[in-house]
Amino acid sequence: MNVIKFPAREDWAKIVERPHLDVSELNQTVSAVLNVVRQRGDEAVKGYELKFDHVDLNDLSVTQKEMDEAEQQVSNELKEAIRLAHHNIKVFHESQRFTGKKVETQPGVTCWQKAVAIEKVGLYIPGGTAPLFSTVLMLATPARIAGCREIVLCTPPGRDGKVNPAILMAARIAGVSQIFKIGGVQAIGAMAYGTESVPKVYKIFGPGNQYVMAAKQQVSLHEVAIDMPAGPSEVCVVADDSCNAEFVAADLLSQAEHGIDSQVFLITTSNKVIDDVQEAVSRQLNLLPRKEIAQKTLENSTLVLVNDLNEAIDLSNAYAPEHLILQTENYMELAEQVVNAGSVFLGQYACESAGDYASGTNHTLPTHGYATTYSGVNLDSYQRKVTFQHLTAEGVSNIGRAVELMAEAEQLDAHKNAMTVRLNSLK
């Protein structure tokens, strides 16, 4: 773990910089796969499933029988955990329902908005070393609340042609419409373009590796919307002497086990915290089954010693982390200063894992510094706002001349005339 003490502000940009990868070759590969999927549909998807996921599929769809079998394979204890998480996610996202009100901007001029669901959405759920069934809940639950008519899910099958049963169980609980055994770039292409089996969707959500992220970016240029650009997962912990070093170490490791490209960042006002956390990390690391992955992540992690907590928050805002944990004595006060973060965890008991699974907030969050401009997934992600305006004769009288003058100044005579004929009708 790299320790930096009292860095000058002019050096912060270098400290918070994410690694940049040359993706030119990767983008060419992704583009080629997408083009074949666009042209050949199911045939191409099945071919890529055989090539990349090593499974020969006759049917891309998950059947009702497979759903029922999966439910039997998931323990009752895990089912209850999934239901609890789903309940909390549902409660939190239902609280985000839009309640538009009519506003009279001038007498006779009334404006308002209406929230309208995106009709068809696609969810990508990674498989691999950690099948993320929790992400099914995070993406499908708000889609269902928003009123999306069709919720399509793609996830890679195992070599036996089966989808992880917990993913299917979560999909059933959250109300997914259709599930397909497709992974990687071919899944993104199938949802973006549509195939004989997979319906074309209007917006694609979900995490994935560099190939999946590149595919989402490419299809978003022409075909569909996406939730957000994304990079490797990351956490920043701000801690002072009041923190529990064991808790901080556990939080850093929970992020480090995601993958070797994950980012781990600790900002503290105490030398002792740095020493205690490093010792606790070393001890806890040896207990992890994914020790090797976490170890490689930690080699690129950063521990920063700063002068005070105000400086710590300034540095965190410059970093704009996906996850921000405040383990300080005055965490509520500090929270008011946070402006750039995907999701914030307050106090020693609010571990990142709580938000990852069951507190109710969404864990699909902006990474790679995008928290400066993007929100995490929320109910608005699945809706559009349609604006309405109604003018009476009085309204035309009140704003008509202003419209004429502005249209004339922009040299848009037809725009001016559309109002002029109405004004003349009132004379």
Residues covered by each model-derived region:
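Conserved small-residue-rich beta-alpha loop and adjacent elements
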Residues: V103-M169
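A glycine- and small/hydrophobic-rich beta-loop-beta segment
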Residues: H258, L266-A341
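Flexible, glycine/charged-enriched surface loops at secondary-structure junctions
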Residues: F98-V103, A225, S262-I267, L287-T297, ...
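N-terminal Rossmann-like NAD(P)+-binding subdomain of aldehyde/semialdehyde dehydrogenases
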Residues: M1-E119
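Conserved NAD(P)+-binding/catalytic subdomain of aldehyde/semialdehyde dehydrogenases
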Residues: G175-F247, D251-S254, H258-Q263
